[in-house]
Amino acid sequence: MDLASLRAQQIELASSVILEDRLDKDPPQLIAGADVGFEQGGEVTRAAMVLLKYPSLELVEYKVARIATTMPYIPGFLSFREYPALLAAWEQLSQKPDLLFVDGHGISHPRRLGVASHFGLLVDVPTIGVAKKRLCGKFEPLSAEPGALAPLMDKGEQLAWVWRSKARCNPLFVATGHRVSTDSALAWVQRCMKGYRLPEPTRWADAVASARPAFIRWQEIQP
C-alpha cells in the first residue's frame, strides 16, 4: 500500500473541494443519506443509501450494496476504503439527490478530505459530513444543553461545527463535504432533525444498513 501516493492524492483532491454553496436546486427536492459498515470481519464493505423527500423527510427509496473490501483499515485513509461501496449503492438509485448527507467526515480531516468530500467530488454532488467522533482539530467544551455549539478549529481554520443535537448525547461534527458551506451544512442538518441524535438522512441510512426496527416497521406498512 503506497501511502505516500494516497496522501498526495488526498491533497490534490482536497484542493478541488468547493467550500461554498453550489446546490443545483435550492431548496432541494430529494435529500440522500449514506452509511458505510463492514461485515465478515471486514472482508465485505456494505453501503446503504436512502432517498428522502424534502421538506417532508419521507423515505422514498433505499439501496444497499455489498462488495469485497478493497483495502485494509488505515487511519486517515478511510475514504479510499469506503467510496467503492458508496459508488455501487449510488449507481443503483433510480433518482439522484440534490444534497447528500454522509455518515463520516467532510473537510474535518487532517488533509481536508474525509469520505463526504471524497465522494462528493467523485460524483459531483453537494455533500455534508456528519461525524460522531473528532478526527482532528480542537474545540471548546460544550455545555450539556441541546443546541450547544462550538467551532472545530485546526491551525486557525474552521473545519466544522461541533453541535449537541440532543440532550445527554455526544455532539456531532458537521462539516462541508463539497459544494456546501460550513454554516449551510449546519443549517441543513438542523432542518433535517426529528428529535433524534442524527439527522433523518443518516439516521435512515443507518437503520437500513443495520435492519433496525424503524426500517422493519417502515417495510411492513409499504403497499
UniProtKB/Swiss-Prot annotation:
- Assigned GO CC terms: cytoplasm
Q: Where does Mg(2+) bind?
A: D35, D103
Subcellular location per the Swiss-Prot or TrEMBL entry: Cytoplasm
Domain of life, per lineage: Bacteria
Please give the function described in this protein's UniProt entry: DNA repair enzyme involved in the repair of deaminated bases. Selectively cleaves double-stranded DNA at the second phosphodiester bond 3' to a deoxyinosine leaving behind the intact lesion on the nicked DNA.
Q: Which organism is it from?
A: Enterobacter sp. (strain 638)
This entry's Enzyme Commission designation comes to 3.1.21.7
Q: Where is this site: Interaction with target DNA?
A: Y73
- For this entry, list what GO says about its biological process: DNA repair
Which gene produces this protein?
nfi
Could you tell me the keywords of this UniProt record? Cytoplasm, DNA damage, DNA repair, Endonuclease, Hydrolase, Magnesium, Metal-binding, Nuclease
Sorted alphabetically, which InterPro entries does this protein's record hold?
Answer: Endonuclease-V (IPR007581)
Names of required cofactors: Mg(2+)
Belongs to which family?
A: Belongs to the endonuclease V family.
This protein's record includes keyword Coiled coil: no
Q: Which GO terms describe its molecular function?
A: deoxyribonuclease V activity; magnesium ion binding; RNA endonuclease activity, producing 5'-phosphomonoesters; single-stranded RNA binding
Catalytic activity, per the record?
Endonucleolytic cleavage at apurinic or apyrimidinic sites to products with a 5'-phosphate
Q: Which principal EC class is assigned to this enzyme?
A: hydrolase
What name appears for this protein in its UniProt entry?
Answer: Endonuclease V
